[in-house]
From Swiss-Prot:
It comes from Escherichia coli (strain K12). The gene is nanY. Optimum pH is 7.5-8.0 for 2,7-AN hydratase activity. Transmembrane segments: none annotated. Hydratase involved in the degradation of sialic acids. Catalyzes the reversible conversion of the dehydrated form of N-acetylneuraminate (Neu5Ac), 2,7-anhydro-N-acetylneuraminate (2,7-AN), to Neu5Ac. Also catalyzes the irreversible conversion of 2-deoxy-2,3-didehydro-N-acetylneuraminate (2,3-EN) to Neu5Ac. The reaction mechanism involves keto intermediates and the transient formation of NADH. InterPro entries: Gfo/Idh/MocA-like_OxRdtase_C, Gfo/Idh/MocA-like_OxRdtase_N, Gfo/Idh/MocA_Oxidoreductases, NAD(P)-bd_dom_sf. Homodimer. This is 2,7-anhydro-N-acetylneuraminate hydratase.
Amino acid sequence: MINYGVVGVGYFGAELARFMNMHDNAKITCVYDPENGENIARELQCINMSSLDALVSSKLVDCVIVATPNYLHKEPVIKAAKNKKHVFCEKPIALSYEDCVDMVKACKEAGVTFMAGHIMNFFNGVQYARKLIKEGVIGEILSCHTKRNGWENKQERLSWKKMKEQSGGHLYHHIHELDCVQHLLGEIPETVTMIGGNLAHSGPGFGNEDDMLFMTLEFPSGKLATLEWGSAFNWPEHYVIINGTKGSIKIDMQETAGSLRIGGQTKHFLVHETQEEDDDRRKGNMTSEMDGAIAYGHPGKKTPLWLASLIRKETLFLHNILCGAKPEEDYIDLLNGEAAMSAIATADAATLSRSQDRKVKISEIIKHTSVM
């Protein structure tokens, strides 16, 4: 039996707890969340801890799941590691590369597992695209292009997710596509350029994050990538396109359909596990109160079918690893800190590029910091 404690049981943390509790030989023994802990503890019949220190030091906990707001990840991760607890940390791992390195280093020094919650790696469509790329089906990769955007109206109650200092804004909070590009290409960029701004979302009812971001990545191999995020787009789009010398792949999360195009012929594949899940996401994109690509949940809200399936898959992967399973090659970087650190390093380089209006080398971010 592996016992889990969860720090932060709002929208996503509560769902992580619910699905982990469903796996064989897995048990949520306690939670800590001053606002939401009591209700979730009652639901899961576990202990509502009175403090973070009480949870991370408890003998009832083998692994700590950290799902607090983004800016509060570092303390529970490091305290869990110092208490010899395995750690799962929801994305983005941190809001700075230095913090991310400190967290990964603490877990390595303690000899405990550290898993980055980059859930997009578990998409059926991403796994299939990775397989096609490795098999050379679309030839040599030339470029990637991603978009994750939509339109956001004024909110009666502002979430922490709209405050840049707490969420990191679209770049960090929606880091999935950046991590996905680096995962699919198998390398991190050499240089990063980003422009952006807040063009339409200032004043009452809005946070302080940029509502448009445009990033360009140049890789050591010569590959290129462009990425776009924002909440000031009245034509919502959400996709990843990989272009090769023989063909291309599109993982479209707005229309929820995967496509492989070679020689003018298109073959379709599932983005998620079943057609029902793809249909569920497509329908949700059309009916949600906010465009699907930029929508976010809140405590008390349950995840849609497609996301519930992903959480089940992700938590089962973690549980199997802690039970002694060996990870497949494509997932090793989720467990050794590489995915966590490389995504944040690129995001930090992009942030520096925008603030200083110049092209930034990744080496400027990572040269002074190492993980043993």
